[in-house]
């Protein structure tokens, strides 16, 4: 019995220790912000929320949260928000596409297609 207990304890010591999630946590008037922080144990998501005052002006807020619900900005409403969620190390660092960027995609594709 003690032999089995010893094997169990040795195997248990070999398991990786769970580490707290790290996210960028900040609030910024502009495109993006980066400030890494270790999240509390109860926080299992990194969240990025962009509140649009106009299609070109926004406030970015990044945080650690215990639960997260993703939303999409429609590109037209004032004071509307878009929220993205993720669950791995510093996953909320990169920005996501803004309505202005998305509007350029068809023009770039048309230009590329005309060159062929």
From Swiss-Prot:
Q: Record keywords: Signal included?
A: yes
**Annotated GO biological process:** regulation of neurotransmitter receptor activity; synaptic transmission, cholinergic
Q: How does it sit in the membrane?
A: Lipid-anchor; GPI-anchor
- List the InterPro entries hit by this protein, alphabetically: Ly-6/neurotoxin-like_GPI-ap (IPR051110), LY6_UPA_recep-like (IPR016054), Snake_toxin-like_sf (IPR045860), Toxin/TOLIP (IPR035076)
What keywords are annotated for this sequence in UniProt?
Answer: Cell membrane, Cell projection, Disulfide bond, Endoplasmic reticulum, Glycoprotein, GPI-anchor, Lipoprotein, Membrane, Signal
Q: Which CDD domains match?
A: TFP_LU_ECD_LYNX1 (cd23585)
> What would be one Gene Ontology cellular-component term for the protein?
side of membrane
Q: Where are the disulfide bridges?
A: 23-46, 26-33, 39-64, 68-85, 86-91
User: Where does the record place it?
Assistant: Cell membrane; Cell projection, Dendrite; Endoplasmic reticulum
Q: Please name the Pfam families in this protein's record.
A: Toxin_TOLIP (PF00087)
Q: Where is the signal peptide?
A: 1-20
Tissue localization of expression is: Expressed in neurons of multiple regions in the CNS, including the cerebral cortex, thalamus, substantia nigra, cerebellum, amygdala and hippocampus. Also expressed in kidney, heart and thymus, but at lower levels than in the brain. Expressed in the primary visual cortex (V1) and the lateral geniculate nucleus (at protein level).
What did gene disruption experiments reveal? Answer: Mutant mice show no gross abnormalities in size, viability, CNS morphology or longevity, but demonstrate enhanced performance in learning ability and memory and are more responsive to nicotine. Aging mutant mice exhibit a vacuolating neurodegeneration that is exacerbated by nicotine.
* Primary location: membrane
Record domain UPAR/Ly6: where:
21-104
GO: which molecular function terms? acetylcholine receptor binding; acetylcholine receptor inhibitor activity; acetylcholine receptor regulator activity; ion channel inhibitor activity
Keyword Endoplasmic reticulum: yes or no?
A: yes
What positions belong to the pro-peptide in this record?
A: 93-116
- Give the positions of lipid attachment, kind GPI-anchor amidated asparagine: 92
Q: What does this protein do?
A: Acts in different tissues through interaction to nicotinic acetylcholine receptors (nAChRs). The proposed role as modulator of nAChR activity seems to be dependent on the nAChR subtype and stoichiometry, and to involve an effect on nAChR trafficking and its cell surface expression, and on single channel properties of the nAChR inserted in the plasma membrane. Modulates functional properties of nicotinic acetylcholine receptors (nAChRs) to prevent excessive excitation, and hence neurodegeneration.
Complexes and interactors? Interacts with nAChRs containing alpha-4:beta-2 (CHRNA4:CHRNB2) and alpha-7 (CHRNA7) subunits. Interacts with CHRNA4 probably in the endoplasmic reticulum prior to nAChR pentameric assembly. Interacts with KCNA2/Potassium voltage-gated channel subfamily A member 2.
Stored PANTHER family: LY-6_NEUROTOXIN-LIKE PROTEIN 1, UPAR/LY6 DOMAIN-CONTAINING PROTEIN
* Name listed for the protein in its UniProt record: Ly-6/neurotoxin-like protein 1
Name the source organism: Mus musculus
């Amino acid at each position: 019995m003690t032999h089995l207990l010893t094997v169990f304890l040795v195997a248990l010591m070999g398991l990786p220790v769970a580490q707290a999630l790290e996210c960028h946590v900040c609030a910024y008037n502009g495109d993006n912000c980066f400030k890494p922080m270790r999240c509390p144990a109860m926080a299992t998501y990194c969240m990025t929320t962009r509140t649009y005052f106009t299609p070109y002006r926004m406030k970015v807020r990044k945080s650690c949260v215990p639960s997260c619900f993703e939303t999409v900005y429609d590109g037209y409403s004032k004071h509307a928000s878009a929220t993205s969620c993720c669950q791995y190390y510093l996953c909320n660092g990169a920005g996501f596409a803004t309505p202005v960027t998305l509007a350029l995609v068809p023009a770039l594709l048309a230009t590329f297609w005309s060159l062929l």
